[in-house]
């Protein structure tokens, strides 16, 4: 099974939809904790309506995959969100199950957040590690090209000069939210 990730960045609504259509995405899973943007066309209500016109399903997954957690049990010793703890949580596991079921039903799913660069976003650092054994993961870039997750992981290992498991932990420390 295949799953995409994408960042809406500051794109126009039309360009963003073109990005999705280029890869036949028919289901957007919004992983933003707060599904609103300074670019109003990416606010939950507006993006949902725009996608519906294009026959693309919109699903808000803030509870399952949002990165701005406040529960103490999901924070590390420094008070930052601990991605491993989030991945072990019941809401996150329900989200994985919903993604798997959707993909099995034939939906072409993309996880959407705001950040254009996947390595700077929790969709890569927090969510992808839970998907990498079940899915082929492709990151849609600004220019509509895709980058294989295996290539992004090579970049991550190179950045931190360590193994992939440790590199994901270091990325967590770098990008995690502090409530």
Regions inferred by a protein language model and the residue ranges of each:
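Residues lining hydrophobic/aromatic ligand-binding pockets adjacent to catalytic sites
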Residues: 1-179
């Amino acid at each position: 099974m295949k799953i995409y990730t994408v960042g809406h960045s500051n794109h126009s609504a039309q360009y963003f939809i073109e990005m999705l259509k280029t890869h036949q995405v028919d289901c957007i899973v919004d992983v933003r904790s707060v599904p609103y943007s300074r670019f109003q066309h990416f606010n939950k209500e507006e993006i949902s309506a725009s996608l519906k016109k294009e026959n693309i399903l919109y699903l808000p997954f803030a509870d399952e995959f949002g990165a701005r957690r406040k529960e103490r049990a999901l924070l590390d010793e420094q008070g930052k969100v601990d991605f491993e703890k989030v991945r072990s949580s019941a809401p996150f596991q329900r989200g994985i199950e919903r993604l798997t079921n959707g993909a099995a039903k034939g939906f072409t799913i993309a996880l959407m957040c705001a950040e254009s660069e996947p390595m700077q976003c929790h969709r890569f650092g927090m969510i992808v590690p839970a998907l990498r054994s079940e899915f082929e993961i492709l990151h849609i870039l600004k220019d509509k090209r895709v980058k294989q997750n295996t290539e992004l992981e090579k970049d991550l290992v190179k950045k931190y000069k360590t193994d992939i498991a440790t590199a994901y932990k270091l990325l967590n420390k770098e990008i995690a939210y502090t409530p």
